[in-house]
Amino acid sequence: MPVEPEPSPWVFPSRAELAALPVLDDVEADVEADGDGRHDGSDLVAVGADLAPGTLLAAYRNGLFPMPEGRSIGWWSPAFRGVLRLDELHVSRSLRRAARDFEIRVDTAFDEVVAACADPRRPHGWIDGRIARAYGELHRLGWAHSVEAWRDGRLAGGLYGVAIGGLFAGESMFHRVTDASKVALLGLVEGLRSDPDGAAGRRLVDVQWATRHLCGLGVREIPRAGYLAALEDLLAVPVAALWERGHPGRAG
């Protein structure tokens, strides 16, 4: 079981306060709609605080996640949240075939996954040393996890995020081999689906923004208020067995 850290001294906006935030742009005309998902001027809701474990968990429980904002930390709650329901993952025949060439492992190379996601050569990189250290500490406490796609004994791709109850808040993913990040996502979903307690239908993968790439895998947008309303039930779901036992094996 994950270890609950010291509570944060910081107070974030409540879920009710966040749900009441207006969308600042005209959804039909002015909201950016590109390969990176739709971004609204109201997505950034706070700046400051710290990245202590208790602060991070308080943020996720209120529907927020951190990204660097200059030298400070920004706290984000997208007006249009990208989410993946476990029964809505789109798996093409080619991806299913490709998955046979990979082995899925959980939490065997967390730091390496984060480092690969933070590679400064990647476009639009945002993971700095502060973020890497903070999530490493969350991992050691049992809250942050990696799902890894291995091939021929080498890490080929993966993803990492934070698991609280029925919520998996995905932070980033990478691949060194074609389709490896998609296979890791498939491994995540299949691992959560295999829950022996029957809670799979009450779990959700949060991907922050619905990029064009992720929409092709079944991700869709929901309004901020809808996401925040779902959080209360999600947080009450038991921890997935996937994070307790790991899930080595083949995806697909």
What are these regions (language model features)?
Residues 1-252:
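N-acyltransferase acceptor-side catalytic subdomain
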